[in-house]
């Protein structure tokens, strides 16, 4: 790694705390706070932390004025303190200010806009700021919460995941992406995202369903590009376990999108279809992609951090993450996630048991990642 972001692990830790909190808030009737904790607190903060690491390295340069990243983290901490103490309007304002500073801080560090992944991440950053602005306007009573949520998930999360996985998966399986097709995906993604967000701005559910079909088509094209990579794969060895986690997560992307389209066009299926849509997209696709990303990124950040401090840090990368145990984590998590979906489909109050099931998944993940966090302080 050319640059090591020392603030990234703290963004990741706060993101995981928000994921934990979301599992309990989902049992309440506070829909807005649930979206704040899961979408903005878990997904959004993971994206911010990851981009503080990925973007400077994509430019082969150190982050300028790194203390600004700590200011951003402080503002984010304040925002979630405000959210969880009932001050949603001030919390969303601090979140927007932190996101805005984050955007300009990283933008000033981008000199080469040509790489495909960089452009995906820049689009993700733009939508991240817009989602925070829309959330603030929601709490002021001007915009629906659905617009802010989908600006982050469809706009920021998917752009970031598409861009990063189109770089990481070919690298990890030693294949080459067809750049021309990747460029087509980028263009189509920006068109489909804009169409879907305009539909949510209008809150016309027929338009949302139609625009959702366009977004679904783009997702299928992304899946096709990944299929092509594995079809051309010359090496007979199985992919790394982190890639297996990414692939497992991808199973839930088209399913979750179809449930979202179905929910928009069949109001009578609510709220069951909407809850399953959230389970598939956020607790399934989003969470397992993030789990894989953290398991790949965090140990490398910590190891390089300690190597920069002293040539022999006294531990190896294998001490931070055990590749063999990742296979076990994936196998148990897959079974538990299937149980989570099944139990969450039950009538109230039995569906509450699903929270316990997902807590076990989180415990298994923390068992794999906790050493990387602990070695920060050694």
From Swiss-Prot:
TM segment ranges: 7-29, 33-55, 68-85, 90-108, 115-137, 152-174, 204-225, 245-267, 280-302, 347-366
Cellular localization per UniProt: Cell membrane
Membrane disposition: Multi-pass membrane protein
Keywords, sorted A to Z: Cell membrane, Membrane, Transmembrane, Transmembrane helix
Protein name per UniProt: Uncharacterized protein aq_267
Gene Ontology CC: one annotated term: plasma membrane
Chief subcellular location: membrane
